[in-house]
Amino acid sequence: MQDRLTRLRNILEKEGLDGLLISSRPNTFYYTGFTGTTSKCLVTKENAFLVVDFRYSVQAKGQVYTGIEVIEHEKDVNDSLNTLCTRYGVGSLGIEGEDVTFSGYHSLCENLKDVKTMKDIQDSLNRVRIIKDSEELLLIQKAVDLADNAFTEILPFLKPGVREYEVALELEYSMKKMGASGVSFETIIASGPRSALSSRVSMSSR
């Protein structure tokens, strides 16, 4: 996964920045391997840090990719980020414009004392993820095969009188039996006239 850090550092060079702050859960997982809900990842030209609170310290150390150091913050995550930015000379910082809220942006401005410039690099991050590496392609194919096999397995269950939510539960159970970690979104099963409707949750219709 070093290639992903390399791609982040290419963004640093292209944008003329000293550091990047990854804050959204999808990008945190993609670039660090961490699956927890609360963290901030700071990437500089030579270092990478994942800042978490005490609840996620052990988990993070077991999940992060090589080249990323886990830092456990004590009070406020921005205090640790400020220390790191000062220590590693981060005066300009790229942030995720789609994830950082208005209040979050002002909090960064107030707490990161040595950071004089912040720039939205969301588009650059998203473009990096468009190009799938070999491992991603394998995982995508594995997910496709698993979903196909799970659907094939429940075909005998599809009979008149079965409720939509029962089919959804059966499909999710089948996928998890085969190794799925979960579903991407709530499973949608629609039968009869309801199959012409736009995305909706599965109901008790038969």
For the regions a protein language model found, what residue spans apply to each?
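Terminal domain-start leader segments
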Residues: M1-F49, V58, N78-N82, T86-G89, ...
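Flexible, acidic/His-enriched mid-domain "rim/lid" segments that flank
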Residues: D3, D76-V183, R194
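Short, basic/aromatic beta-hairpin or loop at an interaction surface
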Residues: G19, G182-S195
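Short beta-strand segments
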Residues: I22-S23, V51, E96, A190
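Short helix/loop capping segments that flank catalytic or ligand/cofactor-binding pockets
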Residues: Y30-Y31, Q59-K61, S103, L197-R200
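Acidic/histidine-enriched ion/cofactor-binding microenvironments in catalytic or ligand-binding pockets
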Residues: V43-T44, R87, V183, S195-R206
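Short, polar loop motifs at secondary-structure junctions
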Residues: V52-V58, V100, G104-Y105
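Compact, glycine/acidic-enriched structural inserts
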Residues: D53-D79, T83
